[in-house]
């Protein structure tokens, strides 16, 4: 009995027509991305279009022609630079977007090769592909990917990148090959990208929207001196043709590249089996912002090169490698309007009101624009298609407009001259301020709502039931006049608002919880009281420093600006803001109301805890077994130390837990002492001398 060999159904006319339109749209976006460095849609939106095209071709295989965008690499090359042929074709990578898709790929690979393979997992750099050719150890030429066979020669520009050696070094184990073709990614380190944009703004020029586009534009400058000033980086991640070297594995290839003086990623891991691969995907999904450059996924490669050869390639991508793509952190959407919000300190902030779009795994329709000057600097108009970015837990940000998408119907935003809530004339707090404020601080309804809501925030009293709706309800029902009345609330007060009243007229469960939470909050430490008072510039860090130095609100109030400014972590601006706040009568009334209601206004110092970390900057990275992140921070602060968020030459110690990320690498690079959890405990108990004695 023979198997059926029935031919696949050809695509109907309307499907073929749709395929043609979609393929042309994808080609245009490829051209704008790879050649012009001026995309008008996000990477995520492009992936959706390409995925739709691929799905059509899977359903109707006769649509999959050799010139389909799904079968080609890159977007060709422009005529601005001389063309350069690659010695071996530069392929792209196929993508997966979910762990079950990744496991399916691994299962398919292991059906052909056998189980429990070794895989090399490395972060996927969001940069620009570059091909380097070395002859007898000297850089001969550099070219962009282009269409995978031919790219643009950018040798002079590549020579200006510090990471790219002009001459290779050799070792006994890895002598220099006669010919070596190396593939890698050119990128911007995030701190260098920020510095570049700051310099462009200072020169009155438009900043770049993102590091990837700026890296592409910088690499393709006609004047190499401009490229040199841009401080690009490069990391190598593969080989093309070579004479005199044949790696046994991907890991072996990377070891050789490093021995020759070529840059390789420190964010790689050689693992066995699907579960370990998925673990790496999840780890870097949580730590993608710990890397010095942008990443948009994890690349998984079969490690053994003999198996790579057995698996082979399609016309566009190797079958032995896959890219797991994380949810895109940038998207394009329509800017429907620009509105303003009045904050708790009176600051009037414009914000973007947009068509909802999914970015970084969540739906976003609002994003801050900071102030009127920032709106002008970004050059956004109402009606623009804009690039939106949301990185992890960071507040969504409008990066700028897609100028090429303008229709002529867009129009400029004008900042209001009067408060939209209380109609008070707006003005900067002082001459030269970029922000404008509503000076009606005590009575402006918007500021009142925001201040009451702020009292309950995680950085302040952390009162769960007191959300924005509750704050609004309490004020509108006149259950409170301002935040000063919160800790005196009674059951009768809460019954004035329907939010805390049952249908039968009694106090709801949430009302009871609010009263209980307010009562518990009265014993919170002094630094939380300081944060809750809505003093300009005083966040948890400055509040902890002030509370640690003075111990009571009375002592802080009585201190001079000079005494306040002398506290480590405070400084002149914060000191002046604190002194100014306590000089306002109605502010004093809030403090008096809270004190009368039983809110603790001073800390009880535990004299048994030594101040043995005075002046030391300590960074904690990774997960500790016996300390939460907040507990570790508190333990450092209570001993007089500073719990820093980044590693520098001034860092005294870096405490490393499980999965520490790039801060550990930075510490090693700078020679900063690294402690494990046991070392951290010794440091807390005995200070720096205790860890010095143990040989750290």
Swiss-Prot record:
NCBIfam families documented for this protein: dnlj, PRK07956.1
GO CC annotation, single: cytosol
Keywords, alphabetical: DNA damage, DNA repair, DNA replication, Ligase, Magnesium, Manganese, Metal-binding, NAD, Zinc
Cofactor(s) listed in the protein's UniProt record: Mg(2+); Mn(2+)
Annotated Zn(2+) binding sites: 419, 422, 438, 444
Gene this chain is encoded by: ligA
Family statement: Belongs to the NAD-dependent DNA ligase family. LigA subfamily.
Catalytic function, reaction form: NAD(+) + (deoxyribonucleotide)n-3'-hydroxyl + 5'-phospho-(deoxyribonucleotide)m = (deoxyribonucleotide)n+m + AMP + beta-nicotinamide D-nucleotide
EC code: 6.5.1.2
Binding-site positions, NAD(+): 43-47, 92-93, 122, 145, 185, 301, 325
Example GO molecular function: metal ion binding
Active site (UniProt): 124
CDD domains in the cross-refs: LIGANc
GO biological process entries: DNA repair; DNA replication
Function (record text): DNA ligase that catalyzes the formation of phosphodiester linkages between 5'-phosphoryl and 3'-hydroxyl groups in double-stranded DNA using NAD as a coenzyme and as the energy source for the reaction. It is essential for DNA replication and repair of damaged DNA.
Organism from which the protein derives: Rhodococcus jostii (strain RHA1)
UniProt protein name: DNA ligase
Residues covered by the BRCT domain: 608-696
NAD among keywords: yes
One Pfam family here: DNA_ligase_aden
DNA damage in keyword set: yes
Disulphide bridges: none
Domain of life: Bacteria
């Amino acid at each position: 009995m023979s198997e059926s060999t029935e031919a696949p159904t050809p695509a109907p006319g309307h499907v073929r027509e749709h395929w043609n339109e979609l393929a042309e749209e994808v080609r245009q976006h490829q051209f704008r991305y790879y050649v012009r460095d001026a995309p008008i849609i996000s990477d995520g939106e492009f992936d959706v279009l390409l995925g739709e095209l691929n799905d059509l071709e899977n359903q109707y295989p006769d649509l999959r022609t050799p010139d389909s965008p799904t079968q080609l690499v890159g977007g060709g090359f422009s005529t601005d630079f001389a063309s350069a042929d690659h010695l071996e074709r530069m392929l792209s990578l196929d993508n997966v977007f979910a762990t079950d898709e990744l496991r399916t790929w691994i299962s398919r690979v292991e059906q052909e090769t056998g189980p429990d393979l070794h895989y090399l997992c490395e972060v996927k750099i969001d940069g620009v592909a570059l091909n380097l050719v070395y002859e007898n150890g000297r850089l001969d030429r550099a070219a962009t990917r282009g269409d995978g066979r031919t790219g643009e020669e950018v040798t002079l520009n590549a020579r200006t990148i510090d990471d790219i050696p002009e001459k290779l070094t050799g070792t006994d184990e890895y002598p220099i090959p006669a010919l070596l073709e190396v593939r890698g990614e050119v990128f911007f380190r995030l701190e260098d990208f920020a510095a570049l944009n700051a310099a462009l703004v200072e020169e009155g020029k438009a900043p770049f929207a993102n590091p990837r586009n700026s890296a592409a534009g910088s690499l393709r400058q006609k004047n190499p001196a401009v490229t040199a000033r841009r401080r690009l980086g490069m990391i190598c991640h593969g080989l093309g043709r070579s004479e005199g070297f044949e790696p046994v594995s991907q890991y072996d290839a990377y070891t050789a590249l490093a021995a020759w003086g070529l840059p390789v990623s420190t964010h790689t891991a050689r693992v066995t089996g699907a579960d370990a691969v998925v673990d790496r995907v999840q780890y870097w999904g949580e730590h993608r912002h710990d890397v010095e450059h942008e990443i948009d996924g994890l690349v998984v490669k079969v490690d053994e090169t003999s198996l790579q050869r057995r698996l082979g390639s399609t016309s566009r991508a190797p079958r032995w490698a896959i890219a797991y793509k994380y949810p895109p952190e940038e998207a394009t959407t329509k800017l429907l309007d620009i509105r303003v919000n009045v904050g708790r300190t009176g600051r009037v902030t414009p914000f973007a009101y947009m068509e909802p779009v999914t970015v970084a795994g969540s739906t976003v329709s609002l994003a801050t624009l900071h102030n009127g000057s920032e709106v002008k600097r970004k050059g956004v108009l109402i009606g623009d298609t804009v690039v939106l970015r949301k990185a992890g837990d960071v507040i969504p940000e409008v990066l700028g407009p897609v100028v090429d998408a303008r229709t002529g119907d867009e129009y400029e935003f004008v900042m209001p001259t009067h408060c939209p809530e209380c109609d008070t004339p707006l003005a900067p707090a002082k001459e030269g301020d970029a922000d404008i404020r509503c000076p009606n601080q005590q009575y402006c309804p918007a500021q009142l709502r925001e201040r009451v809501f702020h009292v309950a925030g995680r950085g302040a009293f952390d009162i769960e039931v007191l959300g924005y709706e509750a704050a609004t309800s309490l004020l509108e029902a006149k259950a409170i006049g301002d935040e000063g009345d919160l800790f005196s609330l009674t059951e009768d007060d809460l019954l004035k608002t329907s939010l805390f009243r049952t249908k039968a007229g009694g106090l709801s469960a949430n009302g009871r919880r609010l009263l209980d939470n307010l009562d518990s909050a009265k014993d919170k430490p002094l630094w939380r009281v300081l944060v809750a008072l809505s003093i300009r510039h005083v966040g948890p860090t400055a509040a902890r420093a002030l509370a640690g130095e003075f111990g009571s609100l009375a002592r802080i109030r009585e201190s001079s600006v000079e005494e306040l400014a002398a506290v480590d972590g405070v400084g002149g601006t914060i000191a002046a803001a604190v002194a100014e706040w306590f000089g306002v009568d109605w502010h004093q009334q809030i403090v008096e109301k809270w004190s009368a209601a039983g809110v603790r206004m001073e800390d009880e110092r535990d004299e048994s805890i030594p101040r043995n970390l005075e002046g030391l900057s300590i960074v904690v990275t990774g997960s500790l077994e016996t300390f939460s992140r907040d507990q570790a921070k508190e333990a450092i602060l209570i001993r007089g130390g500073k719990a820093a968020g980044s590693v520098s030459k001034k860092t005294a110690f870096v405490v490393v837990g499980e999965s520490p990320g790039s801060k550990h690498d930075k510490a090693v690079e700078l020679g900063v002492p690294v402690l494990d959890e046991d070392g951290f405990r010794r440091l807390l108990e005995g200070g720096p001398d205790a860890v010095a004695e143990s040989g750290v």
